[in-house]
Amino acid sequence: MPTVKEVTFNLLRKLGITNIVGNPGSTEETFLKNFPEDFDYVMALQEASVVGIADGLSQGLRKPVIVNVHTGAGLGNAMGNLLTAYLNKTPLIITAGQQTREMLLMEPFLTNIDATQLPKPWVKWAYQPARAEDVPGAFLRAYATAIQEPAGPVFLSLPLDDWDKEMSFETPVRSVSTRKGPDPDCLKTFANKLNAARNPVLIYGGDIARAGANAWANGVAFAERLNAAVWDAPFCERTPFP
């Protein structure tokens, strides 16, 4: 039977998530053992750099990137840039190793105590699977949660002995919609008010930069159609206008 690790990596392949940035330790060794050649693992010297690299990479690729840090200490080091990724609405899947399940009761060295509390409130969802068999499903939910608007980081705490456990089933991939749109009636009212304005001003936010390749061009065309000045929203996390 396949292992939890094999099922998880197969799932990640189907989701198109093959980029990982990390600064691992002993609690991540089982995840890294026999690492598949079709995945890219970028190692950085400190966890703040790890999250910063992953944030930029995810924005550039326009898809989630996995972050791999070392139990509670590594996650603590990552918190500053995790806050930034949250404000950037970047879909990162943050993973941290955890002590073996059979030892967690005694809280030995390297145990991440209250693991799901540490990254809050700067993640959309935090979870430690109840069983080894739940690890692939946890990744699927993490993916879905991270990419749905407003996008943002999520966190998984993963006991180090889970990866080599056997699984009797594959985790099916489900489709996840990220589309969002305004209410048609509200949009009509908004358009009428804009058309009636004598000196309109547009304030663009980071959603334009996240919306895809045509969003900038559409933003420019909209401003030109109205002959309107354009301003960035205060403390905008991404550049919305060229």
Predicted feature residues:
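N-terminal alpha/beta PP-like core and its mobile active-site loop of ThDP/TPP-dependent enzymes
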Residues: M1-P242
